[in-house]
Curated annotation (Swiss-Prot):
InterPro entries (UniProt xref): ATP8_mammal, ATP8_metazoa
Molecular functions (GO terms): proton transmembrane transporter activity
Record membrane topology: Single-pass membrane protein
Family, per entry: Belongs to the ATPase protein 8 family.
Record's GO cellular component terms: mitochondrial membrane; proton-transporting ATP synthase complex
Key words of the record: Acetylation, ATP synthesis, CF(0), Hydrogen ion transport, Ion transport, Membrane, Mitochondrion, Transmembrane, Transmembrane helix, Transport
Gene that produces this protein: MT-ATP8
The protein's name: ATP synthase F(0) complex subunit 8
Described purpose of this protein according to its UniProt entry: Subunit 8, of the mitochondrial membrane ATP synthase complex (F(1)F(0) ATP synthase or Complex V) that produces ATP from ADP in the presence of a proton gradient across the membrane which is generated by electron transport complexes of the respiratory chain. ATP synthase complex consist of a soluble F(1) head domain - the catalytic core - and a membrane F(1) domain - the membrane proton channel. These two domains are linked by a central stalk rotating inside the F(1) region and a stationary peripheral stalk.
């Protein structure tokens, strides 16, 4: 069974990493960024809840009229 020749692996792997690095650098350099990024606060709109729009009365058992 023949031996696996690994003498060119270092060159192949190194050239692959170099190529990937160059490709990613080119992709990143073409990306457009905002000139002045500012944090914007989201505009929160307060939704009225049903219990805020109408008056409700909570009856406790002690305030109910006595039933005979």
């Amino acid at each position: 069974m023949p031996q696996l020749d690994t003498s060119t692996w270092f060159t192949t792997i190194l050239s692959m990493f170099l190529t990937l690095f160059i490709i990613f650098q080119l992709k990143i350099s073409k990306h457009t960024y905002h000139p002045n990024p500012e944090t914007t606060l989201p505009m929160t709109q307060k939704q009225p809840t049903p219990w805020e729009t109408k008056w409700t009365k909570i009856y406790s058992p002690l305030s109910l009229p006595l039933q005979s």
